[in-house]
Amino acid sequence: MMNSFFDKMGEKLMPFASKVSANRYLNAIKEGFFGVMPVIIVGSLFLLFTSIPINGYNELMTGLLGENWSQIFMVPYRMSYGIMSIYVVVGIARSLAHFYKVDTRESIVVSFIAIFMLTPVLVTEDGLKGLPLDNFSASGLFLAIITTCLAVEIF
């Protein structure tokens, strides 16, 4: 009885699943995130090292590495999660460039230019200008995905 249920579900869902798997944008997004997974795993390990819930762990690490030991481990975390959108842009642009048979480097550069054009420039009270890194973290993923797909499509 269960086999017949799964067979019927397979018959109903297979056409939809094959259409979804053939979509170039979903494939590009999938490949972009697959490429980012090792970076995310490494960043997660460093974040884990800063917050292990064992009694005496913080004191041990402070004794070994000094008062600001957690900041040492947060640098790799910020370089992975903090700029995750940049890594995803490279993966998506690369995948779409292969699909359209255009130059990969040019597609990545065009995508970066589009992302930077949409990123607001912050001006501090001192008059210093800079890009907010929050837009390149996980909170900027949606904008990065849409912008990259559009930029490579137009390119």
Sequence positions of predicted segments:
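Interfacial/capping segments of alpha-helical transmembrane domains
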Residues: 41-67
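Signature of multi-pass transmembrane helix bundles
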Residues: 1-40, 62-155
